[in-house]
A protein has these predicted regions:
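Conserved RNase H-like, two-metal-ion catalytic cores of nucleic-acid enzymes
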Residues: 1-109
Length: 109
């Protein structure tokens, strides 16, 4: 089951819920416009129980409602996160905290 988050009200509620998580799986979808410009379209988040699809296009301008992404207390697990981080930064103008990249971890096995 998944939930589409496309309103500020729903995103505020979700943010509070996700701030209580120890870890989250995160992925993004984005549109790259040339070499330098990137537009974040969707953030997919799973908290081991449910999946949430945050529609960044419908939400429009970032209004500081994804605090879970920047919390040192919540580990964010990505796979090959280089472009995901770039896309999230393009929307929020903030750097992620406490991230784990499974692709990098695999290279140590």
């Amino acid at each position: 089951m998944f939930h589409i988050i496309d309103s500020e009200r729903d995103l505020k509620i979700l943010d509070k819920e996700l701030m209580l998580s120890n870890h989250l799986a995160v992925d993004t979808e984005f549109n790259r416009k040339g070499k330098e410009e990137i537009e974040l379209c969707l953030i997919q988040v799973n908290n081991s129980e449910e999946t949430f699809l945050i529609d960044c296009i419908l939400l429009g301008e970032y209004k500081n409602n994804c605090k879970f992404l920047f919390s040192k207390d919540v580990k964010k697990i990505f796979h090959s996160f280089r472009e995901d981080v770039e896309a999230i930064y393009s929307w929020t103008q903030s750097k992620l905290e406490n991230v784990f990249d499974s692709q990098v971890a695999n290279s140590f096995l």
